[in-house]
Curated annotation (Swiss-Prot):
Sorted UniProt keywords: Heme, Hydrogen peroxide, Iron, Lignin degradation, Metal-binding, Oxidoreductase, Peroxidase
Catalytic function, reaction form: 1-(3,4-dimethoxyphenyl)-2-(2-methoxyphenoxy)propane-1,3-diol + H2O2 = 3,4-dimethoxybenzaldehyde + guaiacol + glycolaldehyde + H2O; 2 (3,4-dimethoxyphenyl)methanol + H2O2 = 2 (3,4-dimethoxyphenyl)methanol radical + 2 H2O
Protein's UniProt keywords contain Hydrolase: no
Top EC class, one word: oxidoreductase
Keyword Oxidoreductase belongs to the record: yes
Pathway listed: Secondary metabolite metabolism; lignin degradation
Organism placement in taxonomy: Eukaryota, Fungi, Dikarya, Basidiomycota, Agaricomycotina
Gene Ontology molecular function terms on file: diarylpropane peroxidase activity; metal ion binding
Species whose genome carries this gene: Trametes versicolor
Role summary: Depolymerization of lignin. Catalyzes the C(alpha)-C(beta) cleavage of the propyl side chains of lignin.
Membership in a protein family: Belongs to the peroxidase family. Ligninase subfamily.
GO biological process: hydrogen peroxide catabolic process; lignin catabolic process
E.C. numbers: 1.11.1.14
Name of the protein in question: Ligninase A
Amino acid sequence: VTXPDGKNTATNA
């Protein structure tokens, strides 16, 4: 998931 700031908020395991 990408937030409005363009940074990932979820990491794939």
